[in-house]
């Protein structure tokens, strides 16, 4: 009897445990954030894992400076020399107190821009690149559109409040996605302290300190894997923050914008943990991998992945991705090895969720020709060719006979 009761209890507890595990096997609920706009984006695929008013424009304050940093890295060498003009020393807010006529390296101004959030450094870089703040703002907006930003308008390089200076959480994430690819940006953005050496206008060193607590190991907000971030604040713009972090090849970008509370460090850590704990980056194909074969009538070739292909999936999701290959007759077109000739939609097979498009190329050349036909068409062509050849030969024979008769007639006449 006791043995039967014990067996029943073991079975009952096992049943409860299994069902509890099944019930709990779901993605954690995303954290709440106090900012009015927020996003969590995978940097590799651009997939959005969390969103809150991501397309609503807000004043971004000093998070603007990631665009200034991007344009500086794209247009300058770190050792280039900048001669400060009249206007930058007059910039309001946070500054390192540069002087008109002072000569500084681009590298030093970038450190001042990203660590001290120096508004005067931002304006000095802008004038160095474009000649004026107005022209640099045009360059900022042009580059933003190229990156896919749709609700952004910059009017200055530092984020000082202006009624028309606006961007969104999603647009900031796209800019951060681009600038964080630069090794120099990551190095500067992760530096805790830096000193600008004396210049022609300053006899003392200028010490700089990083304001980003996610890279400070003694901070309670320290986040291992953080590879860059930028804070922003003005009274009208409120608090903003943009940050990127990675675990292995999995890299996430979090943006918080227009936050009346100073909780952006805590909220960003919660967002990043939510992303890394619940999702994973899958590399499905590497560039050059044979994806599948194409076999149609007289054409057979390998279809090759044009680029590395990644997708994001929930960790608890057991499904694997499947390919939905574009239907296209390749016999009728000419192409060269390496040309993109087909694409495939990548779907998660449990819910047909489209996770991306894979571009496919050929592993060899293919030329369309009248000599490359199926058997039926070849027979028709051969028959037509023979008929025309016979007609041609008969015409020649007749022509020669006629010519011969004429010669004989002429000979007889003379």
Enumerate the language-model features and the residues they cover.
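Sec-dependent N-terminal signal peptides of Gram-positive bacterial secreted proteins and lipoproteins
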Residues: 2-25, 380-400
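A generic structural signal for short, solvent-exposed coil/turn residues
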Residues: 17, 30-32, 74-76, 90, ...
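Active-site-adjacent loops and short helices of periplasmic peptidoglycan-processing enzymes
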Residues: 23-191, 198
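Domain-terminus/edge residues, biased toward the C-terminal soluble/receptor-binding domains
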Residues: 149-150, 164-166, 171, 176-414
